[in-house]
Amino acid sequence: MEVVKGRGYVYSIQYHIVWCVKYRRDVLNGQVAIKLKELLPQISKDNGFQILEMTIEEDHIRMLINCTPQHYIPNIIKAMKGVSARLLMKEFGDDLRSKLWGGHLWNPSYFVATVSENTEEQIIEYIRSQKRK
C-alpha cells in the first residue's frame, strides 16, 4: 500500500468497487470486453485516479482503485459508468440493445468498500480469483 505525500497531507486511499450490467445480462464479452479493458484505464487516467487491479466478467466488473483525498467516490463511479456506457453504446449499440432495453448498460447501483493495509492483498487476490473459468 503506497503512501503518497501531497501539499500539506499524506494519504493512502484505495477502494474496492463492483458494478453490474443492467438486468445482469451477459454482454461484457468478446469485442465489448476488449474495448472496455481499453476504456476504463483511460477514463481513470483522464480523471486522476489509478486502477490497481480489474476483472471484467460477462455481467459485472470488479476493481481496486487508488485515488486522492480530493476524489469523491460517486463522481468516480459516474465517470467510469457514464463514459464507458456512452462509448460502448456508440460502438456496439445494436448488439447491446438487442440484449438490454431502455438504453441503459449499467445497473444504477454499485458496491464500494475502503481498503486497509491489512486487506489490500486479500482484495487483489479475491479480484484475480473471481475470473470465470
Language-model regions: role of each:
Residues 1-133:
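Basic nucleic-acid-binding interfaces
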